[in-house]
């Protein structure tokens, strides 16, 4: 069994961060070590929430605690998502380095959550800069959305061709794999939900249906990053993991849409997480 240290947010009500990613990864046979960067009543896109940011020291203390009992070498990967403070970025990288000392084969997936003010997604000052200046170069895999793709690459990215250039720029900065979670308005077809995968062997594009919600569910990116990493650890190739992830997320979104609710319906879609009914295929474009 593979083990992932998943360092991201926790919400008591609803689905975002670890709450969105942990159960699907467990369904895929992964033992998830969930370390929460914040504990909130609900996700920030409700516009109001209660809770706290976990003190930055706790990240290192908890990782050290696992090391103290001699089990840190079992960690196969680190996944970071929503980060509660700029200081936490450095602590996460320190934690990854300690894990690499115990298991040189361990990998790091950075889901570079930078916030989206238009959607009400709020992150602390300095987090974006830490992700760009510190985390990106350390990550084996990085999973930006369109906003984050622009920030990480330093390019405007106003069309599909520029998105291709942006992923190439990011590959040159350290990551070995770039998964663009949603191309949004720079995709080929505005009526589809489109994603990109890039590695040193090429670039792949996949399209699936775009489900229209009155209020777009939160936690989809967290689900996407977790599924992709879990699939890789389970031995799938990059493209196989990409396809399984896109198809699973589509099935979760369809289940959520059919239920007519705001929060992701990962439990209701559990069957499709293991064996997705969608069968969309990635196309190599570069």
UniProtKB/Swiss-Prot annotation:
GO-annotated biological processes: pyridoxal 5'-phosphate salvage
Enzymatic class: transferase
Keyword Metal-binding attributed: no
Domain of life, per lineage: Bacteria
Keyword list, A-Z: ATP-binding, Kinase, Magnesium, Nucleotide-binding, Transferase
Cofactor field: Mg(2+)
Binding-site residues, ATP: 111, 148, 181
Recorded GO CC terms: cytosol
GO molecular function, one term: ATP binding
InterPro entries: PM/HMP-P_kinase-1 (IPR013749), PyrdxlKinase (IPR004625), Pyridoxal_kinase_PdxY (IPR023685), Ribokinase-like (IPR029056)
Family: Belongs to the pyridoxine kinase family. PdxY subfamily.
Oligomer status and interactors: Homodimer.
HAMAP family attached to this UniProt entry: PdxY
Name the UniProt record assigns to this protein: Pyridoxal kinase PdxY
Organism: Histophilus somni (strain 2336)
Name of the gene this protein is made from: pdxY
């Amino acid at each position: 069994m593979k083990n992932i240290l998943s360092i991201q947010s926790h919400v008591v009500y609803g689905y975002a961060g670890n709450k969105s990613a942990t159960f699907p990864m467990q369904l895929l046979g992964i033992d998830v070590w969930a370390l929460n960067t914040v504990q909130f009543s609900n996700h920030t896109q409700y516009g109001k929430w209660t809770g706290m940011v976990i003190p930055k020291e706790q990240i290192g203390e908890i990782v050290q605690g696992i090391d103290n009992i001699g089990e840190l070498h079992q960690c196969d990967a680190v996944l970071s998502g929503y980060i509660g403070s700029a200081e936490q970025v450095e602590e996460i990288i320190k934690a990854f380095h300690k894990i690499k000392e115990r298991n040189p084969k361990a990998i790091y997936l950075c889901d570079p959550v930078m916030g989206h003010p238009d959607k009400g997604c709020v992150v602390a000052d300095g987090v974006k800069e830490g992700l760009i200046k510190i985390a990106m170069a350390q990550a084996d895999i990085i999973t930006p959305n369109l906003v984050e793709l622009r920030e990480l690459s330093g390019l405007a990215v106003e069309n599909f061709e520029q998105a291709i250039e942006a992923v190439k720029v990011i590959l040159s900065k350290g990551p070995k794999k770039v998964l663009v979670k949603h191309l949004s308005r720079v995709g080929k077809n505005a009526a589809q939900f489109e994603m990109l995968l890039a590695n040193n062997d090429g670039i792949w594009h996949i399209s699936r249906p775009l489900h229209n919600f009155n209020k777009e569910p939160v936690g989809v990116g967290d689900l996407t990053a977790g599924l992709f990493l879990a699939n890789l650890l389970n031995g799938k190739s990059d493209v196989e993991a990409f396809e399984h992830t896109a198809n699973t997320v589509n099935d979760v979104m369809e289940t959520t849409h059919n239920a007519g609710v705001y929060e992701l319906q990962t439990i209701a879609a559990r069957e499709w997480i293991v064996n997705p009914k969608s069968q969309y295929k990635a196309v190599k474009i570069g």
